[in-house]
């Protein structure tokens, strides 16, 4: 949506690649993008989700790099994309830190954020990395880790190369990327941004996972507060 708004503002052509499953799951956002004049391309390759859309977008860009620019919304992929995304997303952390200091006069004990590719999480973590604040990332356990239908590569994946980056991946014994699963389209990704893998490796951040059912229950509890 942000890309389509920017393109509309500067009168640029905008092509958005989305997995066909995500188009169904995010129909309100698709409507907004089309309203701004974006061309939304349905990707039916592979699992028809985020990773396949990313692959198609990169394929398009590599064949048209002289007249187009590639943009990704998650903090993953080859350098400098994770850094670019983090720099924009860290506004989340800056605003959160400012507001909690204004209201509580102290820093929080912990920061908790969902982690798919990890852009929102790295955005809020960035402002608290050098503070005495626990950082907790929550990966999607989907239908249950034991079922294999999840998106939790940090605790249940292996290190590898994917999408132009070295990070934690969901892959089989032959090194092939496995399908991820999450009720949330934004978390349905078989890898994670490399900075999260680094934070995990040095124990600066803790990463846990919850199932789709647990996430929905938490959403309902929060909505009633």
Swiss-Prot record:
GO cellular component: cytoplasm
Coiled coil location: none
Catalytic activities: (1S,2R)-1-C-(indol-3-yl)glycerol 3-phosphate + L-serine = D-glyceraldehyde 3-phosphate + L-tryptophan + H2O
Domain of life: Bacteria
Enzyme Commission code(s) on record: 4.2.1.20
Keywords: Amino-acid biosynthesis, Aromatic amino acid biosynthesis, Lyase, Pyridoxal phosphate, Tryptophan biosynthesis
Cofactor(s) listed in the protein's UniProt record: pyridoxal 5'-phosphate
GO MF term (any one): tryptophan synthase activity
PANTHER family tied to this protein: TRYPTOPHAN SYNTHASE, TRYPTOPHAN SYNTHASE-RELATED
General function of this protein: The beta subunit is responsible for the synthesis of L-tryptophan from indole and L-serine.
Name assigned to this protein: Tryptophan synthase beta chain
Source species of the chain: Buchnera aphidicola subsp. Rhopalosiphum maidis
């Amino acid at each position: 949506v942000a890309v389509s708004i920017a393109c509309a503002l500067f009168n640029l052509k905008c092509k958005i690649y989305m997995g066909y499953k995500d188009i169904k799951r995010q129909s309100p956002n698709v409507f907004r993008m089309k309203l701004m004049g974006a061309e939304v391309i349905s990707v039916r390759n592979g699992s028809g989700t985020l990773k396949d859309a990313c692959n198609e977008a990169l394929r398009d860009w590599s064949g048209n790099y002289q007249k187009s620019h590639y943009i990704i919304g998650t903090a993953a992929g080859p350098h400098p994309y994770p850094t670019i995304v983090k720099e924009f997303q860290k506004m989340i952390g800056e605003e959160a830190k400012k507001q909690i200091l204004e209201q509580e006069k102290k820093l929080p004990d912990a920061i908790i954020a969902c982690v798919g590719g990890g852009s929102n999480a790295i955005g809020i973590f960035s402002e608290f990395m050098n503070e005495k604040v626990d950082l907790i990332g929550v990966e999607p356990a989907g239908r249950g880790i034991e079922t294999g239908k999840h998106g939790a590569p940090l605790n249940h994946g292996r290190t590898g190369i994917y999408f132009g980056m070295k990070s934690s991946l969901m892959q089989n014994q032959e090194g092939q990327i496995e399908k991820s699963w999450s009720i949330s389209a934004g978390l349905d990704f078989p890898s994670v941004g490399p900075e999260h893998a680094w934070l995990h490796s040095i124990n600066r951040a803790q990463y846990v996972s919850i199932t789709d059912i647990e996430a929905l229950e938490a959403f309902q509890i929060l909505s009633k507060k």
